[in-house]
Amino acid sequence: MACPSLACCLLGLLALTSACYIQNCPLGGKRAALDLDMRKCLPCGPGGKGRCFGPSICCADELGCFVGTAEALRCQEENYLPSPCQSGQKPCGSGGRCATAGICCSPDGCRTDPACDPESAFSER
């Protein structure tokens, strides 16, 4: 009689300990978040021609970057969206991405970076 009840207790404990206790697990488990495609960040700037690179940074190819200006106000909305986003094509600097010609931006700010210069891709031959 003790064996069946012991087996039931062990199965019950196993079921309880294998549950996910983290309340904000992504659908499909913890590793599923790595498989998701990053969405493009919100459009910003004049005519919506730019993309957000941080909560107060908006960059557009033709216009350059706006940091802390009215053009970048829309970028603050990214803080309230549940999924991460990514702007820019090529990684650069320390956790940044190329925003415009010669400019590398991360959520912390922008700086010049020769890796983002479109002419440098052709001059390295």
Swiss-Prot record:
Modified residues (Glycine amide): 28
Disulfide bond residue pairs: 20-25, 41-85, 44-58, 52-75, 59-65, 92-104, 98-116, 105-110
Record's keyword annotation contains Transcription regulation: no
Signal peptide positions on this chain: 1-19
GO process terms (BP): drinking behavior; eating behavior; female pregnancy; grooming behavior; heart development; lactation; male mating behavior; maternal aggressive behavior
Keyword entries, A-Z: Amidation, Cleavage on pair of basic residues, Disulfide bond, Hormone, Signal
MF-aspect GO terms: neurohypophyseal hormone activity; neuropeptide hormone activity; oxytocin receptor binding; V1A vasopressin receptor binding
CC annotations in GO: cytoplasm; extracellular region; extracellular space; neuronal dense core vesicle; secretory granule; terminal bouton
Sequence similarity: Belongs to the vasopressin/oxytocin family.
Entry function: Neurophysin 1 specifically binds oxytocin.
Binding partners and assembly: Interacts with oxytocin receptor (Ki=1.5 nM). Interacts with vasopressin V1aR/AVPR1A (Ki=37 nM), V1bR/AVPR1B (Ki=222 nM), and V2R/AVPR2 receptors (Ki=823 nM).
Protein name (record): Oxytocin-neurophysin 1
GN (gene name): Oxt
